Amino acid sequence: MTTTHGSTYEFRSARPGDAEAIEGLDGSFTTSTVFEVDVTGDGFALREVPADPPLVKVFPDDGGSDGEDGAEGEDADSRTFVAVGADGDLAGFAAVSYSAWNQRLTIEDIEVAPGHRGKGIGRVLMRHAADFARERGAGHLWLEVTNVNAPAIHAYRRMGFAFCGLDSALYQGTASEGEHALYMSMPCP
């Protein structure tokens, strides 16, 4: 058990019985700012701008697995870590995978339930991911985040992540069309 901001949580590897709660976790967010992306022939620039009215983002059900097997089907280079509240309910999770060829641990997904945000759960889940990265010999951690998720971008930067790339076409043809994928990385601590 770990106490963060006065609340007690159990942090552990996911179990098969956690799969339904992981799939059903509310990953939506509301933000009053977004990162505007200016793409030029020579690169790109980011600028945080107000979102008025505040943007509410609900991620659509992707209709299947995209490599994030949750608590089921994990291999030696994949893990899902969970945070469980004192009430036994899932408070958050982080699904990660290691790629040996580039010594990268990818944060496939990290979500914290709305009622548990701001309590350090994401930071502790990321520490578990970093521990797993070190076990695997990873040189860095890497993730993708939409430019409209300013709360997550700020959290990742506080954790030590820095911008390392952009994909302006990743979300074309999806419910997130018009958004840009921002890539962030940090050396394995």
Swiss-Prot record:
Temperature dependency: Stable at 35 degrees Celsius. Rapid inactivation occurs at 50 degrees Celsius.
Alphabetical GO biological process terms: response to antibiotic
Acidic residues compositional bias, start-end: 63-75
pH dependence statement: Optimum pH is 7.8.
Superkingdom classification of source: Bacteria
Annotated region described as Disordered, given as residue ranges: 55-76
InterPro entries attached to this UniProt entry: Acyl_CoA_acyltransferase, Bact_Acetyltransf, GNAT_dom
Function description: Involved in resistance to streptothricin, a broad-spectrum antibiotic produced by streptomycetes. Detoxifies streptothricin via acetylation of the beta amino group of the first beta-lysyl moiety of streptothricin.
Official protein name in the record: Streptothricin acetyltransferase
UniProt source species: Streptomyces lavendulae
